[in-house]
A protein has these predicted regions:
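Early extracytoplasmic/lumenal segment of secretory-pathway proteins
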Residues: 28, 37-116
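Conserved C-terminal helix/tail region of periplasmic/extracytoplasmic solute-binding proteins
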Residues: 361-396
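Paired acidic/hydrophobic, glycine-rich loop segments that form the ligand-binding mouth/hinge
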Residues: 102-108, 244, 261-266, 281-282
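Extracytoplasmic ligand-binding site segments that recognize negatively charged/polar headgroups
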Residues: 56-64, 86-88, 103-104, 108-256
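Short, low-complexity disordered leader/linker segments with a strong preference
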Residues: 1-52
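Extracytoplasmic/periplasmic substrate-recognition and gating elements
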Residues: 265, 274-327, 396
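Oxyanion-binding "anion nests"
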Residues: 244-275
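Mature extracytoplasmic/periplasmic domains
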Residues: 299-365
Length: 396
């Protein structure tokens, strides 16, 4: 099932979670940070295709619509391994001693997994000069913090989406202007929130604007004091929430049935609900928003790097980006995808914010894995292990 419809935003099994986080924590020290940013023997050209490409993907990220033409053109036969969560992707990449174990060549990782893979030495740097479409990406996704460390690229961005505030227009005659509607008692029992530890960043972003004295400048880099304040807010929110949704379809059903009136979601849910004549709209409040972005990353032990580079080159082209965007309710990274999108579905470029102004993109704080290193030479930030534990306490 496709990513936007059925992608799980919550938890993998405890075994997968433990395996993923243990190595991630080990890779977040100074030596890991240094080596992650160290350039190493990047290829200057794409060699002869090896004939095979093994991908870990969000289900449907290599649909026949664009996979079959790639196979015919390159001779690279694509083999797929679907993953249902970021934790599962990390765990799969760490089979066989890590780095894909020689079994997997690439992974379509989201921002809450990419730094775990980089600092865990599971992926290798890539030469974006070999990916012509990269130069046409929106600036925010050319060298984002979630896949580029100290100027070294560990993959190429693919699709992205903002986390928007969705609301019932009959209950809200005008658009809410603040995320505060999700934290106030007025809509108790009518609120829906994603069931994902990275949701902590949304609360931190809200506090960065409403409680500036906390000094939050990056919602993914929180000191203990900032983190505790954020968790306290989420615990106060808990009694107000009708449902923590695991799948986009769960939130769609809740809005369609009238069970909820307002919540955090993606443009996919909004457009799907509108197609069903449900009175909803979406907005990005004054505090800004978080957002997810996926990256095709090259496994450190990839046996078919040439086919991998050809795949990155292929999926970065405007037409393929447009095909995937419309297939999943996502927004392409390539700015030249819009004409292809509109040709396929009139007005879709605007519907998915692909033609949004720079200010819109700048208002989005894209997911990245929380690590102990705050980037200031100190290791006083709360890492992802603690985020996961705290989220269990909030929602359990």
């Amino acid at each position: 099932m496709n990513r936007a419809r059925k992608r799980h935003v919550g938890w993998a099994s405890l075994a997968l979670l433990t395996a993923a986080l243990a190595v991630a924590a080990a890779g977040c020290g100074s030596s890991g940070k240094k080596s992650a940013g160290k350039k190493s023997n990047l290829p200057t050209s794409i060699g002869k295709p090896e004939g095979t490409l093994n991908l870990i993907e969000w289900p449907g990220y290599a649909l026949p619509q664009w996979r079959k033409p790639f196979e015919r053109q390159t001779g690279c036969k694509v083999h797929l391994k679907d993953a249902g969560s970021s934790n599962q992707m990390v765990a799969l990449m760490r089979t066989g001693g890590g780095g894909g174990g020689g079994q997997y060549d690439m992974v379509s990782a989201s921002g809450d997994a990419t730094l775990r893979l980089i600092y865990g030495h599971d992926v290798r740097p890539v030469n974006v000069d070999l990916i012509p479409g990269w130069k046409d990406f929106i600036p925010q996704l050319k060298s984002p913090a979630h896949n580029t460390v100290k100027g070294v690229h560990y993959g190429v961005s693919l699709q992205w989406g903002p986390n928007t505030l969705i609301y019932n227009t009959k209950k809200f005659p005008s658009a809410p202007t603040s995320w505060g509607v999700l934290y106030g008692r007025r809509y108790k029992g009518r609120i829906t929130v994603p069931n994902n530890p990275i949701q902590i960043a949304d609360a931190a972003l809200y506090l960065s604007k409403t409680q500036p004295s906390l000094g939050i400048t990056d919602p993914y880099e929180l000191t203990k004091k900032q983190f505790d304040a954020t968790i306290a807010l989420l615990k106060r929110q808990k009694p107000l929430v009708k449902t923590y949704w695991n799948y986009a379809s769960d939130e769609i059903t809740a809005f369609a049935n009238g069970d909820v009136w307002v919540g955090a979601g993606w443009p996919y849910q909004t457009l799907t609900l509108k197609s069903k004549k449900v009175p909803v709209a979406e907005t990005i409040p004054k505090e800004g928003a978080t957002g997810w972005a996926d990256t095709w990353m090259l496994a450190k032990k990839a046996k078919h790097p040439n086919c991998a580079y050809l795949w990155m080159k292929w999926v970065s082209t405007p037409k393929v980006q447009a095909e995937q965007a419309l297939g999943f309710g996502e927004t392409p990274a390539n700015t030249k995808a819009c004409p292809f999108m509109n040709k396929m579905t009139a007005g879709s470029c605007h519907s998915y914010h692909a033609d949004a102004p720079t200010a819109y993109f700048n208002s989005i704080k894209f997911w990245k894995t929380p690590v102990a290193d705050c980037g200031n030479g100190k290791k006083n930030c709360v890492d992802y292990t603690a985020w996961q534990k705290a989220w269990t306490e909030v929602t359990g």
